[in-house]
Amino acid sequence: MEIRKASVSDMFGWLISSFKLVGKYWGTFMLAALVSLAAIFLLAFVAGLVIGLGAAGAAMGDVNSIDWQKIALMYAAILLVALILVPPFIAGWFVLTGKLADGQSASLGDLFSGYGDATRWKKLIAFGFIGAVLNIAVQGGYILICMALGIGSDDIGQFMSAQLNNDPEAMAGLSSGFWAAYAGIILIGSVLQTAFMLGFCQVALTDTGAVDSVKDGIAATLKNLGSLLLFMLAMLLVVIAAALVIALLAGLLIAAISMLNSNIALALGAVLYILLLLFIYPLMFSFQYLFWRDVLGGGGKPATVSDSEVLI
């Protein structure tokens, strides 16, 4: 397996190509994103209903009367079901994206193509299980090391309390050591996410086994770690700047409309949020696919998308 090295400029090239790809096939991607959001909301509703029924019978406000062991078992069962059902759907996203990126015809049916191949489905489940175990081991090991060294360990209780109570003053009072450890978790999580998504493309789009796909994803990430970290840093700055501008413009628009009708402003805010989600899903999968294709896959250049073909 040849693992190719990419530069920061290559990664920005994938990002630009992703925007163009989503723009060219806007309708197909939006329908796929709508199906995905509907599936997520349905799973979240069912999960909430199951857990809620598990807590039924508890006195109002009496946390001690809840059977937490039963809740934990239900939560574990939900995670197990998700581990079985979700991977083929994600694989379908990469199949759909790959066809569009390579200029092939694609349809919403490609989202569910992973469910029709039992052998591949088993590989996807195995990959998801291995990835989950590795993620817990690495992140858990990092947290244990930080606690053993006393880095931010004294602030964990304060952080959890501040999160639950939405207390910004308590958050501001956390030590610099805690924030350094917290930044480390985010960094490690981002690197692991990249490795797992590269490996997931490998297991979903090739005949490579689950274990070898995990190894390939990790190896490809480590080989491109320097460029990846620089790209992440640059993107962090870009995202912060873009978020501030978008939030300001959206806030001004919603505030202006709320002066006329608060219900319309609330509905507009919900619509803008949903549109953002509908755009993020295709962009994310497009970038990950192009990343995999040029580093682990066929290595061909991304399909050319002219500016005249982009429909935004």
What do these predicted ranges mean?
Residues M1-I312:
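Hydrophobic alpha-helical membrane segments
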